[in-house]
Regions:
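C-terminal motif of bacterial Sec signal peptides marking the signal peptidase cleavage site
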Residues: 23-26
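Short pre-active-site segment immediately N-terminal to redox-active cysteine/selenocysteine motifs
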Residues: 56-58, 63-66
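Hydrophobic beta-strand anchors of alpha/beta hydrolase catalytic cores
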Residues: 59-60, 90, 136
Length: 170
């Protein structure tokens, strides 16, 4: 009896993970804007997304609508995500923000990459974020966290340098 319950629990968790991954399958950078769209699911959905992207390096940008430096650097991420769309994946994480503020922000700054809602900074803490805004994390193609940059990028060239160093050649 206990074995059946354990197996059923494992199958339930597997089914949830598969459903999350299937729901995220259309959220990549190849193509459309994700204006005004925030993905839920918390840390599990974020980790499922990273697992789905294995084989390509990933840049994760943690931001909030109330963060001035986030607003200043966000256009860099918009442009560089388009520039690197064949070799690097980008993911946004909106942490400790109101849903209305985040949606308004995304209306002004549409992105070609998915954005996760992270009201308690649970996702951000998984990549050493959640303490400073903005924070950018770089994952290698095999899914390992390579580097976390806390604070804003002063120039697009600075962000490009870190993309090359920690994502492309990481």
């Amino acid at each position: 009896m206990a074995r059946r319950q354990a197996t059923a629990g494992g199958l339930t968790r597997l089914a949830i993970a598969v459903a999350i991954a299937a729901g995220l399958a259309g959220c990549g950078t190849a193509g459309g804007e994700t204006t005004g769209r925030l993905l839920g699911g918390g840390r599990d959905a974020f980790q499922a997304r990273l697992a789905q992207l294995r084989g390509r390096p990933v840049v994760v940008n943690q931001w909030a609508s109330w963060c001035g430096p986030c607003r200043a650097e966000f256009p860099y991420f918009q442009r560089l995500a388009r520039k690197h769309d064949k070799q690097v994946e980008f993911v946004g994480v909106n942490s400790r923000d109101s849903r209305d503020g985040a949606l308004e922000f995304l209306g002004k700054f549409p992105t070609p990459f998915p954005q996760f809602e992270d009201p308690n900074a649970e996702i951000a803490r998984s990549f050493r974020g959640g303490r400073a805004w903005p924070t950018t994390a770089f994952y290698t193609a095999d899914g390992q966290l390579n580097y976390t940059h806390q604070g804003s990028y002063g120039t697009e060239a600075d962000l490009e340098r870190d993309i090359q160093r920690y994502a492309v050649h990481g």
